[in-house]
UniProtKB/Swiss-Prot annotation:
GO cellular component, one term: cytoplasm
Keywords, sorted A to Z: Amino-acid biosynthesis, Cytoplasm, NADP, Oxidoreductase, Proline biosynthesis
InterPro entries: Ald_DH/histidinol_DH (IPR016161), Ald_DH_C (IPR016163), Ald_DH_N (IPR016162), Aldehyde_DH_dom (IPR015590), G-glutamylP_reductase_CS (IPR020593), Glu-5-SA_DH (IPR012134), GPR_dom (IPR000965)
Organism: Escherichia fergusonii (strain ATCC 35469 / DSM 13698 / CCUG 18766 / IAM 14443 / JCM 21226 / LMG 7866 / NBRC 102419 / NCTC 12128 / CDC 0568-73)
Entries under NCBIfam families matching the protein: PRK00197.1 (NF001221), proA (TIGR00407)
Protein name: Gamma-glutamyl phosphate reductase
CDD domains (UniProt xref): ALDH_F18-19_ProA-GPR (cd07079)
Main location: cytoplasm
Length: 417
């Protein structure tokens, strides 16, 4: 089965690579329209997936990731339209010039070819990834979580209908609908057809891909994100940022998981934090330095376990740790962070600059929420993933991250001397 999918994807990629920006946008507009026109079939499939997931005991965080509503589906369609409005990087001349020999040389952006994406129970990823791949002239093979098999099948069927109506092969966007995990191992060895693999899931999936894949892998999406509250932070303003970073949508990878509080502000900050977190329904996992004081407040508090500093809660849970100073905060982030998104809240711009320079994450913020690490917020449109590695792409992966380049030399029967 996968062999045939690979062949179809490779053949489709050749045709996609030749499309103009106008032709690609026409396809995307058709997909957006069809997602809305056929929303009932997608929502019905999703309702079945959610019911099965609930019966199987999936957590509230996972159910939130899985669920589609009419508003969310409309938002997904609107995201596709936003991709239409983005500049097409394919064909862009990055740099170039004329050599002494007279050869005119340029470095031009081109599609990668075929992209494989393995992802968790988030049905919006199916459309986000497909739209970005099509915009950049790439074919894609999708392997979503078993919890979303019906939703993904219905969504990809709609996308393939749109492709066919525009005269393009259905092989441009395909989904593996068999939940057999053995197929993942087979997918990892399809370097004959797939040019880049993006796993979006837990540490176990990332480890499997790094160890078994014969395809170049871009890893990311695990977000143990931190906010450091410096001693000069404005408490009222800091709390607004923390509430946003923790509670706006707790199931996302850019949600803050650990709050590091400077010891010199702790006495005034912790009572205010407890009140705010109680109102937001957040459970605090406090270290020894913060536990006693937080236990006198209204928020639910438990003693933090050492291993929880490495946890991506994806829920209304927040670690709270007292640190001595900026150095202590940076050391903690280096030990427990995942190089995703980290922030400092401070009025001391020297500390802010040190934090920016010394915290080695894909996104670092000063006086802002970690929730901004998102392709749409960055003006990149929908994202394929948030890369936490350093080669090829880092941070939210928009259109440029789905391209490579080729060198083109144009001469007049020019020979090398």
């Amino acid at each position: 089965m996968l062999e045939q999918m690979g062949i179809a994807a490779k053949q489709a990629s050749y045709k996609l690579a030749q499309l103009s920006s106008r032709e690609k946008n026409r396809v995307l507009e058709k997909i957006a329209d069809e997602l809305e026109a056929q929303s009932e079939s997608i929502l019905n499939a999703n309702a079945q997936d959610v019911a099965d997931a609930r019966a199987n005991g999936l957590s509230d965080a996972m159910l939130d990731r899985l669920a589609l509503t009419p508003a969310r589906l409309k938002g997904i369609a609107d995201d596709v339209r936003q991709v239409c409005n983005l500049a097409d990087p394919v064909g862009q001349v990055i740099d170039g010039g004329v050599l002494d020999s007279g050869l005119r040389l340029e470095r031009r952006r081109v599609p990668l070819g075929v992209i494989g994406v393995i992802y968790e129970a988030r049905p919006n990823v199916t459309v986000d990834v497909a739209s970005l791949c099509l915009k950049t002239g790439n074919a894609v093979i999708l392997r979503g979580g078993k919890e979303t098999c019906r939703t993904n099948a219905a969504t990809v069927a709609v996308i393939q209908d749109a492709l066919n109506s525009c005269g393009l092969p259905a092989g441009a966007v395909q989904a593996i609908d068999n939940p057999d995990r053995a197929l993942v191992s087979e997918l990892l060895r399809m370097d004959k057809y797939i040019d880049m693999l993006i796993p979006r899931g837990g540490a176990g999936l990332h480890k499997l891909c790094r160890e078994q894949s014969t395809i170049p892998v871009i890893t990311g999406g695990i977000g143990v994100c931190h906010i450091y509250v410096d001693e000069s932070a404005e408490i009222a303003e800091a709390l607004k940022v923390i509430v946003n970073a923790k509670t706006q949508r707790p199931s996302t990878c850019n949600t803050v998981e650990t709050l590091l509080v400077n010891k010199n502000i702790a006495d005034s900050f912790l009572p205010a934090l407890s009140k705010q977190m109680a109102e937001s329904g957040v459970t605090l996992h406090a270290d020894a330095g913060a536990l006693a004081q937080l236990q006198t407040g209204p928020a639910k508090v438990v003693a933090v376990k050492a291993e929880e500093y490495d946890d991506e809660f994806l829920s209304l849970d927040l670690n709270v740790k007292i640190v001595s100073d900026l150095d202590d905060a940076i050391a903690h982030i280096r030990e427990h962070g995942t190089q995703h998104s980290d922030a400092i809240l401070t009025r001391d711009m020297r500390n802010a600059q040190r934090f920016v320079n010394e915290v080695d994450s894909s996104a670092v913020y000063v006086n802002a929420s970690t929730r901004f690490t998102d392709g749409g917020q960055f003006g990149l449109g929908a994202e394929v993933a948030v890369s936490t590695q350093k080669l090829h792409a880092r941070g939210p992966m928009g259109l440029e991250a789905l391209t490579t380049y080729k060198w083109i030399g144009i001469g007049d029967y020019t020979i090398r001397a």
